[in-house]
């Protein structure tokens, strides 16, 4: 890895003004997730960002001990294409003016709605990658040649292991090659599953970016650091919550907000209320259900064009600046 001059232990301010979904795509590492590949946390962070920027409003209803939370589309002008895909997905669940969050999990367990969600989700990902994460832009921060070689080695290793195991399984004199094939298969599968940033490497620019985002994540996860260096306003807290969602640690920031902010401010804050009334939990459950149902469908049958939402057109959708 290239050496950089950056030496800070943590970051208590957002390092760069990249869209939350872009931060999620580049600076979170998981099995099966490549660098520059947004995932479900990025999708949820996009929704949280739309709430924070007042494109979505949070409405609540209380009946006895029952609390219900809804989303309401407030405006759409000026959104990026990937944000418009999210709006189209949410609009599908409108009843009157309100989006009924507790109805989304039920609907996404059905094939028709799950197909639609998967189509939206794929188009959302592709829209982000086209605008912010094309090959040239990713190449400025990350070199994935090593990751490609590792995956090739992995697939060749699995194939070779299967062949050797097949040829030796019934030969009592070939126990050593048989067990060696099992070891090769395990090693090869690990090579295939490794996150890209382990065999690949960051450029100097990319290394500095990822170290700053890691340190910002460390700050958000450490309650003592937040207590020592708290955000200066509710608006900053809300922005931190958006990025925490992208980084997969939203619960840490919500807990810190409970301790640091007055109850009245919390009750007037759409971002906090969305979590407190269970809106975020409902959304997470719904999206997991939709993806699970869609995956089952893809295994069981060939998905046709039914439910295809089409591409977003031009019109009045504004364009933000490039990431990085």
Over which residues does each language-model region extend?
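Donor-sugar nucleotide-binding helix/loop cap in glycosyltransferases
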Residues: 26-157, 274-279
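Short hydrophobic helical membrane-anchoring segments positioned at the boundary
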Residues: 115-119, 123, 127-128, 133-150, ...
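Toprim catalytic domain recognition across nucleic-acid enzymes
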Residues: 1-26, 60-67
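Generic signal for short, ordered secondary-structure residues
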Residues: 22, 29, 107, 188, ...
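Short hydrophobic/aromatic-rich motifs at helix boundaries and adjacent loops
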Residues: 18, 185-189, 212-214
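Hydrophobic, membrane-inserted alpha-helices
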Residues: 155-165
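Alpha-helical transmembrane segments
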Residues: 1, 163-165, 187-198
């Amino acid at each position: 890895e290239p050496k950089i001059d950056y030496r800070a232990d943590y970051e208590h301010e957002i390092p760069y003004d990249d869209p939350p979904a872009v931060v999620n795509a580049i600076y979170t590492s998981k099995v099966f997730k490549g660098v520059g590949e947004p995932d479900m946390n990025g999708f949820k962070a996009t929704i949280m960002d739309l709430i924070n920027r007042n494109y979505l409003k949070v409405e609540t209803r209380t009946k006895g001990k029952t609390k219900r939370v809804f989303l309401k589309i407030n405006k759409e002008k000026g959104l990026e294409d990937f944000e418009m895909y999210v709006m189209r997905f949410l609009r599908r669940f409108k009843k009157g003016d309100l989006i009924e969050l507790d109805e989304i999990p039920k609907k996404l367990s059905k094939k028709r709605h799950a197909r639609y969600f998967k189509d939206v989700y794929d188009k959302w990902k592709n829209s982000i990658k086209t605008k912010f994460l094309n090959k040239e832009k990713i190449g400025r921060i990350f070199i994935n040649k090593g990751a490609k070689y590792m995956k090739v080695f992995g697939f060749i290793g699995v194939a070779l292991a299967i062949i050797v195991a097949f040829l030796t399984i019934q030969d009592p004199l070939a126990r050593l090659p048989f067990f060696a094939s099992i070891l090769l298969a395990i090693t090869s599968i690990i090579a295939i599953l490794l996150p890209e940033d382990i065999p690949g490497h960051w450029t100097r620019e990319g290394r500095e970016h990822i170290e700053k985002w890691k340190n910002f994540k460390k700050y958000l996860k450490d309650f003592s650091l937040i207590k020592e260096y708290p955000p200066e306003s509710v608006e900053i807290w809300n922005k931190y919550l958006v990025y925490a969602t992208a980084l997969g640690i939203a619960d840490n920031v919500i807990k810190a907000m409970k301790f640091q902010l007055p109850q009245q401010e919390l009750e007037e804050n759409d971002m906090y209320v969305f979590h407190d009334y269970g809106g975020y939990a409902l959304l997470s459950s719904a999206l997991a259900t939709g993806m699970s149902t869609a995956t089952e469908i893809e295994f069981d049958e060939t998905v046709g064009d039914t439910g295809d939402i089409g591409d977003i057109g031009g019109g009045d959708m504004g364009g933000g600046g490039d990431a990085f």
